[in-house]
Amino acid sequence: RVCILCCGQEGKPAWEDSICAGLLVERLLLLRPGLSLGKGARTVLEAWCRAGRKLEAAMRSPHARRLREIGFSEDLDFCCRVDVTGIVPRYDPSTGLALDS
């Protein structure tokens, strides 16, 4: 079971989160064709497809523009890197914390 957590913005879904989560869902489907997807996974996959399967769409979101304005350009660039690690964090729902390997 895989859970992708999107933080959103001010209690609402954020476009850039949905685009990035959609990329992750697409990659999971490449690894496991026929994988059963929940409603949220299908929704973010649709967002990713509507964005033309390009992370640049996330970088053009209003929130991303705001982050650039206040000096977080390097952080955005760092976060939009793809395939730079093989590490996947594990989460303990009972504590809300990441698990040690």
Where are the model-predicted features located?
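Short, structured patches in soluble enzyme cores that scaffold and shape functional sites
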Residues: 4-8
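Long, charged alpha-helical interface segments
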Residues: 15-101
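Residues at the starts of beta-strands that form the adenosine-phosphate
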Residues: 1
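Phosphate-binding/catalytic loops
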Residues: 11
